[in-house]
Amino acid sequence: MTMDTAQLKSQIQQYLVESGNYELISNELKARLLQEGWVDKVKDLTKSEMNINESTNFTQILSTVEPKALEMVSDSTRETVLKQIREFLEGIVDTQ
């Protein structure tokens, strides 16, 4: 019996929320992004994009800003959060 990817993802997300780990990881990420000034940089980037392209809508702005915002996440923050996620997954996934 195999589980498809969507089912597995759904179960992991559910367990992540129920165990409280989602909130812990999310809070850590938010704190690090605020501390690094990432939030302000993304706000500035968004404002700039809106001024340059006054006729664009939310979807267009998001498609422009999101890739740049993701690139602006520091390596240390990315590594820390991914480590937390890996540790969580190792705790629930049977690798044998």
UniProtKB/Swiss-Prot annotation:
Belongs to the ENY2 family. GO terms for cellular component: DUBm complex; nuclear pore; nucleoplasm; P-body; SAGA complex; transcription export complex 2. GO terms for molecular function: transcription coactivator activity. It is found in: Nucleus, Nucleoplasm; Cytoplasm, P-body. InterPro entries: TF_ENY2, TF_EnY2_sf. It comes from Saccharomyces cerevisiae (strain RM11-1a) (Baker's yeast). GO terms for biological process: chromatin organization; mRNA export from nucleus; protein transport; transcription elongation by RNA polymerase II. There is a cross-link at K68 (Glycyl lysine isopeptide (Lys-Gly) (interchain with G-Cter in ubiquitin)). This is Transcription and mRNA export factor SUS1. Signal peptide: none annotated. Keywords: Activator, Chromatin regulator, Cytoplasm, Isopeptide bond, mRNA transport, Nucleus, Protein transport, Transcription, Transcription regulation, Translocation, Transport, Ubl conjugation. Component of the nuclear pore complex (NPC)-associated TREX-2 complex (transcription and export complex 2), composed of at least SUS1, SAC3, THP1, SEM1, and CDC31. TREX-2 contains 2 SUS1 chains. The TREX-2 complex interacts with the nucleoporin NUP1. Component of the 1.8 MDa SAGA transcription coactivator-HAT complex. SAGA is built of 5 distinct domains with specialized functions. Within the SAGA complex, SUS1, SGF11, SGF73 and UBP8 form an additional subcomplex of SAGA called the DUB module (deubiquitination module). Interacts directly with THP1, SAC3, SGF11, and with the RNA polymerase II. Involved in mRNA export coupled transcription activation by association with both the TREX-2 and the SAGA complexes. At the promoters, SAGA is required for recruitment of the basal transcription machinery. It influences RNA polymerase II transcriptional activity through different activities such as TBP interaction and promoter selectivity, interaction with transcription activators, and chromatin modification through histone acetylation and deubiquitination.
